[in-house]
Amino acid sequence: KRLLQTVLSLDIRTKICRLLLEDFINEDEKSLSKSLYMSKEQIKEMISNGMHFGSHGKSHFWFSSLNKIEQEKEITSLIKFLNSLYNKDYLLTMCYPYGDYNECTLELLTKHEFKLGLTTVPKTYNSGDSILEVPRWDTNDYYPKK
């Protein structure tokens, strides 16, 4: 999984994913996406009813695998998408894909005025912790694995 997500070039990853999709799912990417994901209209309806949508990156890349220019593009693209959903001010929040980020990510989120960043670090938030590195508990952290 990590090889596919971070080591291989985007070109090769895309080709492999398309082949896997064709061979094992037997459905084209557009149809599958439509059945799995919410439409823009559904998201807007949820927002109008008080739901908050934060960001998870535009392309769900490991941020630390991207250089500063690529991270900037990823972040500005997702801000543009969120702007197309909200018709009023909203809080920019980030839930790091795979829990992965680096100092460059934090600098860019600060530059773009993100108000919150959620990590995958399993611990309780303390008032001295960075607001862009908020730890959180996963439900899997509470129950022993059998």
Regions found by a protein language model. Name each.
Residues 9, 27, 32, 42, ...:
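Generic structural signal for short, flexible, solvent-exposed coil/loop and linker residues
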Residues 15, 48, 65-146:
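C-terminal active-site subregion of NodB/CE4 polysaccharide deacetylases
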Residues 21, 54-57, 93-98:
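Short beta-strand segments
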Residues 25-26, 57, 87-88:
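Generic signal for short, ordered secondary-structure residues
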Residues 38-55, 110, 128-129:
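Acidic (Asp/Glu)-rich catalytic clusters
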Residues 59-62:
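A short, flexible beta-alpha/helix-coil linker loop
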